[in-house]
């Protein structure tokens, strides 16, 4: 395996577990994801896809470019960056590229990455959370009858991203839920991942009218300076939801 180097703001999103790295590579193969390859300080770029993985020997095989001179520069490079940019960003680097002959033609071979970045972009992709067994966010708020005391407001999540969460709240709204209000010590128990301890800030409140049903609100919260540990938990849960969404879409196709 090759150990990759990442920039400082990507460190909290690094996947170290070999089984997770292998699973991510297999997902990229399964969904025929396009991978951008850059080298020569970004001067050379091409798009490829992963052909196969040999977990036993720790080898990953990718399609090679058609230009021989370009391929020579690629094979001579000692720092090549591989990025899947759409949806959840996947990134890793390799210092050793080899040209090989497979039964279907030429390919490039790299070592299975020891580390890779898996990053959900903040500005894209809110993933719906389970409806049958909703994920609950517990928010400490001032007690209505005794503001000096706190009570726990439990809200069901409807979606989540790396930037924040969406919750569904029945009318009437708790008076503490106003735009811009921040709450410390909020806990979300993400299934199969763990429990967060976050500061959440009310970002938006949208009234939802459904025929013959009481008025409800979608209350959106953003995370306020989450710790690396909390961001890691959120990122892993988002990745689980993305895989479930992809599997569902392919099953319905």
Curated annotation (Swiss-Prot):
InterPro entries: PilZ_domain, Split_barrel_FMN-bd, T3SS_YcgR, T3SS_YcgR_PilZN. It holds the Pfam family PilZN. The keyword RNA-binding does not apply. The keyword Cell membrane does not apply. Keywords: Bacterial flagellum, c-di-GMP, Nucleotide-binding. Monomer. Interacts with the flagellar basal bodies. This is Flagellar brake protein YcgR. The gene is ycgR.
